[in-house]
Amino acid sequence: MKWLLCINNKDYPASLEVMKLYKQLDDPTAEQLGMVRIIDESGEDYLYANSLFIQVPTVFGNYIDMALSV
């Protein structure tokens, strides 16, 4: 699973928290448009600009997945 770190919540303060990790859902069409699909604070999945996040390196994402599965 891919994880993203929010680095900017401008225009979305109720939906995104800066410095919070979000699960990236697979959406190839969104990626072609420079967007990412995540589950935000509402608990629903929405599209956001890719520029609001940085991708967590896979090795750290694997550790996050393992920690959450315990």
What are these regions (language model features)?
Residues W3-Y12, E17-Y48:
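Basic/aromatic-rich interaction segments and small domains that mediate binding to polyanionic partners
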Residues L47-V70:
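C-terminal structural segments of small proteins and small subunits
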